């Protein structure tokens, strides 16, 4: 998978690969609309990581949406998308023309009735081709766990209304192309990061070890986008986060022992979309999250929090 993920055990057991149950498959689709002929429904529903090559159309996207119940990571960076006209695509129950090299409208969002839509909530990461021209309306609407959209194209594809949520998804683009994306219509509010997404889960047994363990594993702190820390944290670890991790998108501290988020820890983390706070948290320091303008949704404060210092969430206008 393109998201580099390691599990660091700091109690001297070394580095273990993430061992969550995964089923990875790769298929080359020779004829558009025939993906489901290559596997059974039972096989499709067990796949978590899918790489597709060859030729796809809106029929294939409908099956990806409606079956493939556990699909988390979808890589179609080496697949082309063919034009399709008919009633068997992703649009609800009507004839529709789906243009070539476009992510179809409602590709991963199913209409339940006139006002209710259901996104594919299992999906966490998609990797799109450098040939994609459009991401059509509602393509990823309601995909509430889609944390990563990687686009291989150096210029932004056209983004149609409701196609992708800037409050949920960080967009990873080729080196040197983030300015072009920021100037694209409907792309202006997204968090753009150049290069490949990097995620790390660290279990700390010795306080202050976060920096040395990352470097020992060959990961520079500045490259980390998705950070999960378990175990013991001290001020040195928070200082590392504050001073050397500018590109954080998502942070999970729920299983660490910290009772205080120190002053200025996450100040001006401009890509930060969400955070899970330590369960035993008691205090949030001054300006701890100030200027995190993309931090959004509902922030759950642990029941033991008794102090939120001055300006802790100043400028976090998208938080509820």
Please name every model-derived segment.
Residues 1-24:
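Bacterial Sec-dependent N-terminal signal peptides
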Residues 20-43, 198-220:
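The feature captures the LRR N-terminal capping module
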Residues 23-31, 48-56, 71-86, 91-102, ...:
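Structural signature of tandem-repeat unit edges
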Residues 39-47, 67-68, 164-166, 216-224, ...:
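Flexible, charged surface loops at secondary-structure boundaries
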Residues 60-67, 138-139, 237-241:
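A short acidic, amphipathic alpha-helical/loop segment
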Residues 63, 84-87, 240, 264:
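Amphipathic alpha-helical interaction surfaces in cytosolic regulatory modules
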Residues 106, 136-141, 161-163, 263-265, ...:
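Consensus positions within tandem repeat domains that build extended binding/scaffold surfaces
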Residues 184-189:
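Helix-loop-beta element that forms the nucleotide-linked donor phosphate-binding surface
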